[in-house]
A protein has these predicted regions:
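Short, charged phosphate-coordinating catalytic segments
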Residues: 128-132, 237-262
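DNA breakage-rejoining catalytic core of tyrosine-based enzymes
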Residues: 151-212, 276-290, 318-330
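C-terminal secondary-structure termini that scaffold catalytic or DNA-interacting sites
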Residues: 448-451
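Short, basic (Lys/Arg/His-rich) helix/loop patches that form interaction surfaces
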Residues: 64-67, 218-220, 350, 365-366, ...
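Catalytic-site neighborhood detector that most strongly recognizes the C-terminal catalytic loop/helix
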Residues: 421-446
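Conserved tyrosine-mediated DNA breakage-rejoining catalytic core shared by Y-recombinases
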Residues: 215, 250-335
Length: 451
């Protein structure tokens, strides 16, 4: 009986000592080596992206497996697969699914993302030497997973059949692309009415009433009662506008005194290419590997504790870093005061047998993680009477929305906001600065009152 399972593997494509850990798919015929090679060519992609690619190809293999001898033409199988992603495989009238897949209906955006991942992989397959050899047998008679996947790649290459996942006809016209036979559904354009920014009037409460250390009480001194680490990180998010993953990449040496405004100067470097704090090392990846036997945190697997993402922000220097721009500027001084208290009273130094350069640590002295900070933030939000919810802006990402909207309220231009938020595209900041319908109505009322 056939099966498809995912496992972590160590991949090496030459005789050097270089090796990487990748997620891989195994079938009854063995490892799907072509997809493993595909992932190995995508080292610049995040671990999250690689996991989604594996998941997408596994879905296709699962679908091929349960539909053995069902389709004469590969294009018909691919069309049916695309349809099943969108509508599911369950007959809800009979509460039955003969295929055993039991796929529920997927959101259009999610289904199209799956198709996009498969298309990238089949494009890769179609470019490989020898892929013609794996199509010696008709698709219906093909036995190996690799052969079936190469048939999918063949149809993709010959007739652009697999998918067109653009979200609008206007975008398609601009791109002037060839429309493929099998297309993802068009996703309706929706402007999110609920602006997901953290409530401005609740931020101080979050810091000084929400972030309370375990087993503390009101009678204790603030150095024992307040959680300075979580306060400092939240200030970086809300007043510095950084993404929640970016604090994980900050070294202790990256936080210094600003030479002009007496606040903190915080630089966030690229996890791999950023300049090393020790000039004898070429970059941060070499520095981490050589001095600490660690990897850049982007290169750990998603399931590993040290993993942290990186959204490719706009870097401003050949040393591959950007500077945190505090808003208001005085927040840089407030952050520095909190950070100094964290270092003096609460930071647990790294273990002697497991040293590291990271600024924020947990109770064991290990590098702090996004997951642990999310837990602390959730409890702090609940402690001040709010409900942790992305739609209410009360998750960690709501702080970045607050930062962008605050800059817009201060009158900064779109280009200035782009630079402050370190976006490569000037339009990326628009989602952070859009007003709600209620705010537009209130502005209309104020203008009309002057008539």
């Amino acid at each position: 009986m056939g099966y498809i399972i995912k496992r972590k593997v160590i991949y090496r494509n030459d005789r050097t000592g270089k090796k990487i850990k990748l997620p891989a798919l195994f079938t009854e015929s063995g490892i799907v080596i072509s997809h493993l090679r595909f992932l190995a060519t995508k080292q610049g992609r995040s671990q999250s992206w690689k996991e989604k690619s594996v998941f997408s190809v596994k879905l296709l293999l699962d679908y091929i497996h349960v539909n053995e001898n069902t389709f004469e033409r590969t294009v018909d199988l691919l069309q049916s697969f695309s349809d099943c992603l969108n509508v599911g495989t369950i007959d809800y009238n009979q509460m039955h699914d003969p295929s055993g897949l039991f796929w529920k209906r997927r959101d259009v955006k999610y289904a199209n993302n799956i198709l996009a991942h498969i298309t990238l992989y089949t494009d890769f397959l179609a470019r490989q030497k020898g892929y013609e050899d794996n199509r010696e047998n008709p698709f219906r008679n093909a036995t190996l997973a690799e052969q079936k996947l190469n048939w999918c790649a063949y149809y993709q290459r010959q007739a652009n059949v697999f998918l067109n996942h653009l979200s609008s006809t206007t975008e398609a016209e601009k791109q002037c692309i060839k429309i493929r036979t099998i297309t993802g559904q068009l996703q309706p354009k929706v402007e999110n009415e609920k602006v997901k920014r953290f409530p401005e009037d609740k931020f101080v409460d979050l810091l000084y009433r929400g972030f309370i250390r375990p087993y503390s009480n009101i009678s204790m001194h603030e150095n024992e009662r307040l959680d300075y680490k979580s306060i400092a990180i939240s200030m970086l998010l809300n007043k510095g506008g950084i993404r929640k993953s970016e604090f994980c990449h900050i070294y202790s040496s990256d936080i210094t005194l600003h030479p002009v405004n007496d606040g903190a100067l915080v630089r966030i470097y690229h996890p791999s290419f950023g300049s090393s704090p020790d000039p004898q090392y070429k970059n941060r990846e070499t520095y981490l590997k050589t001095k600490y036997n660690l990897l850049p945190r982007t290169k750990y697997q998603l399931s590993e504790r040290l993993y942290a993402g990186w959204k490719e922000p706009l870097l401003i220097d050949s040393q591959y870093y950007f500077e945190v721009i505090f808003s208001p500027v005085s927040a840089g001084k407030d952050f520095l005061e909190v950070y100094k208290k964290y270092l003096k009273y609460q930071r647990v130094p790294p273990p002697k047998l497991a040293p590291h350069p990271f600024a924020f640590t947990n109770q064991k002295g290990e590098p702090e993680t996004i997951k642990n900070f999310q837990r602390l933030h959730k409890r702090a939000v609940e402690r001040i009477g709010l409900i942790p919810s992305k739609n209410e802006g009360t998750t960690e990402h709501g702080h970045r929305h607050s930062y962008g909207y605050r800059l817009a309220q201060f009158g900064f231009s779109q280009v200035e906001i782009q630079k402050a938020m370190h976006h490569k595209n000037s339009n990326s900041c628009l989602v952070y600065i859009q007003p709600t319908s209620d705010e537009i109505v209130e502005k209309m009322k104020a203008i009309e009152a002057l008539w």
